[in-house]
């Protein structure tokens, strides 16, 4: 909770600075001179409220959504020795990372994958695919679990949601400025907002949202290196490298993780060229090399 409060305070400061900057550069006067009567401060606050509301709501229901979308079965009472080992391993890693033990689950998927989610590092969920349990060695599975525990301990789910909230705020803000400008200056709408405002705003939100997603994905990729580093500390560098190498050998297996969980899985598939800017995970080769440099 403290992380959320501190991050929200930081982002409120960003919104305040943005408002002051627009005023200092005379943006309000520029808009008024062109016939656009728009209170930018009120608009910025409105966009911040709705931008963060959607992001934080998604965060608070993330565990429930993850279970529903992946078919994850929570292990409350282990029925097999593999489930017993899984619970014991997560319990040990959580203790070493200084967090409360998360819920542990298995989801039915042939692909080798795992994810962590939850609004609080002491109220999280870690789940692994059936395919990963069947084909990976115990050391490799432990390293994957350590990576996911690293996400939880670092508070990555909260931070990523709040970064998304900032992005949402400014996408909504600038899309509405563009919509008002086109409506008032180009189409000369005098009373209220014309159809041009709504069409332009929707189009601008789509374009700006697409471009802004590259910022969120850049942050997500940085976050993966930190989780790999945490995994190496908890399970050993050799085991973490081995798990990533094993994932690399399975890159031909389609990744069917729901879009809402892709950023929280250990394996997100492979994209090349400009599409790489919109990847939630760095290439496995870069992650392996970073761990080797770590020593």
From Swiss-Prot:
| One GO biological process term | proteolysis
Query: Membrane: is it a keyword of this entry?
Result: yes
Active site feature: 148
Single Gene Ontology MF annotation: zinc ion binding
Q: Which family does the similarity line name?
A: Belongs to the peptidase M48B family.
Query: Which residues bind Zn(2+) per the record?
Result: 147, 151, 224
> TM segments?
4-24, 42-62, 158-178, 199-219
Q: What is the lineage of its organism?
A: Bacteria, Pseudomonadati, Pseudomonadota, Gammaproteobacteria, Pseudomonadales
Which terms are listed as keywords in the entry?
Answer: Cell inner membrane, Cell membrane, Hydrolase, Membrane, Metal-binding, Metalloprotease, Protease, Transmembrane, Transmembrane helix, Zinc
How the cofactor binds, per note? Binds 1 zinc ion per subunit.
Q: Which InterPro entries match?
A: HtpX_protease, Pept_M48_protease_HtpX, Peptidase_M48
Q: Does the keyword GTP-binding apply?
A: no
Q: What Pfam families does the record point to?
A: Peptidase_M48
Which cofactors is this protein said to need?
Zn(2+)
Output the superkingdom of the source species: Bacteria
User: Which PANTHER family does this entry report, sorted A to Z?
Assistant: PROTEASE HTPX
The molecule here is called: Protease HtpX
């Amino acid at each position: 909770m403290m992380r959320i409060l501190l991050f929200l305070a930081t982002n409120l400061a960003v919104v305040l600075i943005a408002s002051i900057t627009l005023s200092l550069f005379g943006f309000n006067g520029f808009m008024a001179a062109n016939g656009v009567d728009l209170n930018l401060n009120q608009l910025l606050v409105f966009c911040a409220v709705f931008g963060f509301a959607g992001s934080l709501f998604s965060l608070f229901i993330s565990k429930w959504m993850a279970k529903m979308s992946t078919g994850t079965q929570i292990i409350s009472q282990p029925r097999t020795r593999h489930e017993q080992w899984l619970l014991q391993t997560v319990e040990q890693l959580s203790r070493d990372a200084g967090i409360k033990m998360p819920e542990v689950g298995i989801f039915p998927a042939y692909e080798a994958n795992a994810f962590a989610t939850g609004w609080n590092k002491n109220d999280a969920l870690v789940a692994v695919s059936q395919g990963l349990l069947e084909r990976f060695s115990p050391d490799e599975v432990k390293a994957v679990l350590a990576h996911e525990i690293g996400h939880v301990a670092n508070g990555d789910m909260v931070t990523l949601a709040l970064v998304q909230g900032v992005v949402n705020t400014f996408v909504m803000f600038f899309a509405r400025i563009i919509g008002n400008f086109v409506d008032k200056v180009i189409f000369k709408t005098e009373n209220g907002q014309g159809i041009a405002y709504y069409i332009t705003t929707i189009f601008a939100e789509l374009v700006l949202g697409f471009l802004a997603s590259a910022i969120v994905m850049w942050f997500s990729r940085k976050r993966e290196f930190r989780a790999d580093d945490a995994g190496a500390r908890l399970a050993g560098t050799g085991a973490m490298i081995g798990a990533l190498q094993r994932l690399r050998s399975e890159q031909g297996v389609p990744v069917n993780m729901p879009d809402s969980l892709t950023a929280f899985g250990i394996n997100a598939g492979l994209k090349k060229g400009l599409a790489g800017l919109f990847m939630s995970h760095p290439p496995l080769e870069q992650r392996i090399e970073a761990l080797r440099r770590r020593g």
